[in-house]
């Protein structure tokens, strides 16, 4: 949303917009409706064939589709365009609607490396190369795979590195795997429940490599944040990032959710920290070419035709005082609790 605001758009947000006829009126008067994630399937179905262009932006993992597939329309009007944050999110939709045409539109992140932020003290890592993972502890995120891979490392190799798990425990099984590992390896395996935004940025600036062992992850944000600081990542093939990595140039991909294959990549990285450091320019280039705000703008505008190139006020809808404002030539009463950002 900040990118739309910076471009001079008027943005309306509303949590329950599909339940209000007045808010539907706002949508039909907009220059663009952005339906964010597959959860908006019912709204997309209702707007299919309307005169307003709709950008349906998919960020979703495979895990959610069995619960919502019945709501996804089987055909889309010409006003509906599908985009996804990467090949993984597109493949998830194709698992239930293989005929849909889905274009790439990867989110853009600010250049955190150019910002000032407070320093996060990582002295507990002992000055060793630090391999970190960030995310809620759940089966889909695969912390247990990372734990098994660490245990598979040769003892002498493992002692040369430190490992950090950051995240809240959503599933006990994942948390148990991490707690067991930190108990067995207290000198170089660490767990932190939560870090502030500044602490995350500082972690990305200081760590050696990120590890994403997810079983199902459309586009892990912490991996992208690492790229901003020129840090490579070892990622599962079941992530959106895997489709953009050039093996050994700006990251590494392992297959089959296999801890042994992850351990192989980890062992090489631990033994060759200087080669990881040499990957920094390529990692930064990957961020600039695919994940920067400028890259998002290029993707958003390239190839758009007609109304997609004339967007002036995309709308999201939220709900406070009744007021009147003109939208795209329509004079509309703004419903209670509706936030207008411009």
Regions found by a protein language model. Give the residues of each.
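Short alpha-helical donor nucleotide-sugar binding micro-motif in glycosyltransferases
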Residues: 26-27, 194-195, 202-207
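A short, active-site helix/loop in glycosyltransferases that binds the activated sugar's phosphate group
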Residues: 43, 66, 78-102, 109
């Amino acid at each position: 949303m900040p990118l739309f605001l910076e471009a001079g758009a008027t943005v309306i947000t509303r949590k329950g917009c599909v339940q209000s006829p007045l808010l539907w009126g706002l949508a039909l008067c907009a220059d663009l409706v952005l339906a964010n994630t597959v959860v908006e399937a019912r709204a997309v179905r209702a707007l299919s064939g309307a005169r307003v262009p709709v950008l349906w932006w998919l960020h979703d993992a495979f895990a959610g589709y069995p619960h919502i597939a019945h709501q996804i329309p089987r055909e889309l009007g010409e006003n509906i365009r599908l985009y996804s944050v990467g090949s993984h999110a597109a493949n998830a939709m194709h698992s239930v609607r293989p005929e849909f045409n889905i274009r790439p539109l990867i989110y853009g992140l600010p250049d955190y490396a150019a910002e000032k932020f407070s320093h996060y003290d990582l002295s507990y890592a002992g000055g060793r190369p630090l391999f970190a993972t960030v995310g809620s502890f759940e089966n889909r995120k695969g912390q247990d795979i990372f734990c098994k891979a660490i245990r598979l490392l040769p003892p002498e190799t493992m002692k040369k590195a430190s490992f950090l798990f950051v995240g809240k425990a959503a599933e006990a099984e994942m948390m148990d795997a991490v707690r067991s590992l930190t108990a067995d390896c207290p000198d170089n395996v660490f767990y932190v429940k939560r870090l502030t935004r500044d602490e995350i940025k500082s972690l990305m600036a200081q760590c050696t490599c990120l590890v994403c062992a997810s079983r199902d992850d459309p586009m892990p944000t912490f991996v992208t944040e690492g790229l901003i600081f020129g840090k490579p990542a070892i990622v599962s093939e079941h992530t959106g990032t895997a489709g953009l990595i050039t093996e050994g140039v700006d990251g590494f991909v392992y297959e089959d959710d296999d801890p042994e294959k992850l351990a192989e990549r980890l062992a090489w990285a631990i033994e060759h920290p200087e080669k990881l450091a040499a990957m920094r320019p390529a990692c930064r280039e990957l961020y600039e070419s695919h994940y920067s705000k400028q890259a998002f703008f290029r993707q958003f505008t390239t190839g758009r035709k007609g109304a997609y190139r004339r967007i002036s006020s995309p709308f999201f809808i939220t709900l406070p005082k009744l007021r009147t404002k003109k939208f795209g030539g329509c004079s509309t009463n703004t419903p209670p609790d509706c936030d207008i950002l411009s």
